[in-house]
């Protein structure tokens, strides 16, 4: 296991230049002016992430313009100060994934030691982009009712989206504005999470407990999203903060409250358990390392165990048919040798191949009869197990350098009957899936130029 993780990490770093990536952060820009609308150059702009304590700084140019890009999502405190003006603090500025917010800052004349604090969100509308999208917060997704607590079906809350497999955990087949589902791009922390064999869905579905935000972009998106002409579904995972936080969860489903399928003679037994825990916070080792404001972790271990019984309805040969007696068939059987009908519609025992007799005995006897002529039914057990893990590390080297690494392995076990009447014919699928994203951000300013380096996504 350790070797597999190491190989994935090395591969992500070596092939970084070949791997495309989509933006998983946000940005702000704007103008600093005084009460007469005159621009204020050389004003110091500072953003502080409320959850992690990390700060981002810049200064306005000669035209009073400023911008800060590649900011991790979260809630910020924005401050602006300049000589001869009161310090302005904007609290509760929430930045979502792919946001690019314009914030106009107006400073009041006064002493720098004086401070003006503005409570509430400074900007609620994105005026910098014509992108049409819908955003869901991970906390809201946990509270909303959902079958199986799957993430991808939440895409159906966006206008213009339909699916013929709305509850599927991975193969969601979401059709956006009439475009085929194979034209969608599914992203996990900016790295592709796509079934490259046919692009019908995702190799793995993130656990809902790990999701910070889920943005579905359906139109007018920027050039960074270029793999498909449909929608871009961008899932951002949670990271640690300065406070230790976590969850312990268990969700149980069973057939007692389910309705019977109209075409089934009985209610199919089902029991499902989704349980696990998550924990995140600063990396802290007493007397060795204090990672507050610098190094954070987030870990999830989860299990999904489902037991159900599939209902099979089939037509099987009667006991008479198995011995060659087709007198109850209602139409004559003809001898292939002479073209004449068999006497009494009974095939002589000497004419029946013994291998065919052995094969016929493998069929079960009829135990049921419906209007469609089906005469056999049974419930066959099915096992669906999923082991989920998520590991994420964020480290801030400085205000200009930061790195994020996330590794999400998943293992699925499916065991089920494949053929009606033959209980010994079963299929056993063991499917591993892995997704890893690593990115390194370098922000530097020279004549208002900003750069970002993406290290890898796999």
Segments (PLM) and residue ranges:
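Transmembrane beta-barrel strands of outer-membrane/channel proteins
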Residues: 120, 248-254, 299-303, 405-409, ...
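A surface-exposed, glycine/aromatic-enriched loop/edge motif typical of exported proteins
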Residues: 303-362, 456-458
């Amino acid at each position: 296991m350790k070797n597999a993780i190491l190989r994935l990490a090395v591969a992500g770093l070596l092939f970084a230049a070949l791997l495309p990536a989509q933006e998983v952060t946000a940005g702000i820009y704007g103008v600093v002016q005084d009460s007469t609308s005159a621009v204020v150059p050389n004003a110091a702009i500072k953003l502080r992430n409320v959850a992690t304590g990390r700060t981002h700084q810049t200064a306005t140019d000669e035209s009073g313009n400023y911008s800060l890009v590649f900011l991790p999502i979260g809630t910020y405190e924005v401050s602006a100060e300049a000589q001869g003006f009161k310090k302005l603090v904007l609290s509760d500025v929430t930045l979502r994934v792919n946001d690019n917010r314009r914030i106009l800052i107006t400073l009041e004349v006064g002493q720098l030691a004086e401070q003006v604090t503005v409570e509430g969100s400074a900007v609620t509308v994105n005026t910098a982009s014509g992108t049409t999208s819908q955003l869901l917060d991970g906390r809201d997704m946990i509270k909303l009712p959902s079958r199986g607590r799957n993430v991808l079906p939440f895409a159906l809350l966006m206008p213009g989206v339909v699916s013929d497999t709305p509850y599927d955990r991975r193969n969601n087949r979401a059709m956006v504005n009439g475009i085929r589902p194979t034209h969608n791009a599914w992203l996990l922390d900016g790295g592709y999470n796509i079934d490259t064999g046919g692009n019908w869905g995702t190799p793995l579905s993130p656990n809902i407990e790990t999701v910070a935000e889920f943005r579905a972009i359906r139109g007018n998106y920027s050039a960074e999203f270029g793999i498909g002409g449909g929608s871009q579904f961008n899932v951002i995972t949670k990271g640690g903060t300065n406070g230790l936080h976590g969850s312990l969860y268990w969700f149980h489903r069973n057939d007692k409250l389910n309705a019977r399928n109209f075409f089934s003679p009985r209610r199919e037994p089902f029991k499902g358990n989704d349980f696990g825990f998550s924990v995140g916070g600063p990396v802290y080792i007493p007397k060795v390392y204090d990672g507050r404001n610098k190094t954070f972790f987030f870990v999830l271990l989860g299990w999904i165990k489902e037991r159900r019984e599939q209902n099979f309805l089939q037509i099987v040969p009667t006991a008479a048919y198995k011995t060659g007696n087709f007198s109850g068939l209602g139409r004559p059987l003809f001898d292939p040798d002479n073209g004449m009908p068999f006497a009494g519609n009974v095939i002589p025992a000497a004419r029946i191949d013994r291998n065919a007799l052995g094969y016929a005995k493998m069929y079960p006897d009829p135990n049921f009869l419906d209007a469609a002529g089906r005469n056999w039914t049974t419930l066959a057990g099915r096992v669906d197990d999923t082991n989920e893990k998520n590991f994420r590390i964020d480290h801030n080297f400085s205000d200009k350098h930061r790195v994020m690494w996330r590794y999400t392995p998943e293992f699925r076990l499916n065991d089920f009957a494949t053929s009606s009447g033959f209980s010994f014919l079963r299929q056993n699928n063991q499917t591993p899936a892995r997704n890893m994203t690593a990115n390194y951000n370098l922000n530097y300013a020279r004549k208002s130029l900003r750069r970002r380096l993406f290290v890898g996504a796999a």
